[in-house]
């Protein structure tokens, strides 16, 4: 979890798998429910290669995206 001084929150989960399912977002959905409007986004980082949306403000991202800059 990352929190700004203003109280806004981004949730991050890391999975040691190449595939992601909706169940992998359960903790992030719970966090979003608890903090309400302060929740900005949730991300599941995984070992696969695709970036996929999983609903409003939720996204699965390849872990490698952290090291690959776009030009």
Language-model features: locations:
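A cross-kingdom feature that marks ATP-driven nucleic-acid transaction machinery
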Residues: 1-71
């Amino acid at each position: 979890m990352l929190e700004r001084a203003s109280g806004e929150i981004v949730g991050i989960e890391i999975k040691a798998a190449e595939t992601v399912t909706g169940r992998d977002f359960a903790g992030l959905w719970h966090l979003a429910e608890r903090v309400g409007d302060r929740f900005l986004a949730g991300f599941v980082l995984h070992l696969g290669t695709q970036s996929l949306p999983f609903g409003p403000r939720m996204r699965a991202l390849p872990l490698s995206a952290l090291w690959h800059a776009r030009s």
